[in-house]
């Protein structure tokens, strides 16, 4: 009996470690993207009290955003109210084209992945959420729905950030 317990202890430990690492592998995908309170290639998370305006974006099952083209000024903080008007889950992810394509690959591998990043919101049908973002650099910031098949069908848009 003592020999059996000695044999089972290491096996139990190995099984527990394997299960806990698998649990962390799927989780949210906030890690590794650098989308926290620090500045990124597309700006940084904004503070609600500093938002100069609110832009409402509707997502629909025809796989489009309304509006899909938005103009902001460099340095401006915008509150995006994002509404899912459709019958399926949609998301809005802000990023560079490269970041969105990388994220698209992750979503293909983990389509049920939940977002925990200030530059992204995933919404069930009929729900709404918000993103508050400060656009610190002039240029183009892309946004897209990276649910499987949505991006490929054209569910994307742009924020043109004009110089001060």
Question: Could you describe each region identified by the protein language model?
Answer:
Residues 20-22:
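N-terminal signal peptide c-region/cleavage motif recognized by signal peptidases
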Residues 47-77:
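N-terminal edge beta-strand
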Residues 2-12:
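Bacterial N-terminal signal peptides that target proteins for export
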Residues 26-58, 99-113, 150-164:
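Extracytoplasmic/periplasmic copper-protein system
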Residues 86-89:
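Extended, low-complexity, turn-rich repeat/linker tracts enriched in Gly/Pro/Ser/Thr and Asp/Glu
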Residues 82-84:
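Asparagine-centered strand-capping/turn motif at beta-strand->loop junctions
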Residues 91-95:
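Beta-strand signatures of extracellular beta-sandwich domains
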Residues 26-33, 64, 117-164:
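Extracellular/periplasmic metallocenter environments
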């Amino acid at each position: 009996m003592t020999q059996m317990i000695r044999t089972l202890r290491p096996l139990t430990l190995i099984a527990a470690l394997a299960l806990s690492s698998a649990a962390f592998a799927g989780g949210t995908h906030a890690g590794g993207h650098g989308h926290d309170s620090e500045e990124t290639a597309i700006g940084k998370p904004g503070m609600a009290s500093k938002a100069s305006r609110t832009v409402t974006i509707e997502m629909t099952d025809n796989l489009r955003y309304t509006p899909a083209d938005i103009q902001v000024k460099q340095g401006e903080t915008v509150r995006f109210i994002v509404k899912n008007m459709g019958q399926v889950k949609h998301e809005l992810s802000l990023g560079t084209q490269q970041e969105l394509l990388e994220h698209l690959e992750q979503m293909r591998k983990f389509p049920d992945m939940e977002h925990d990043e200030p530059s992204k919101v995933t919404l069930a049908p009929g729900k709404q959420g918000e993103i508050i973002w400060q656009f610190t650099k002039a240029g183009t910031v892309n946004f897209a729905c990276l649910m499987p098949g949505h991006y490929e069908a054209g569910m994307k848009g742009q924020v043109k950030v004009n110089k001060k």
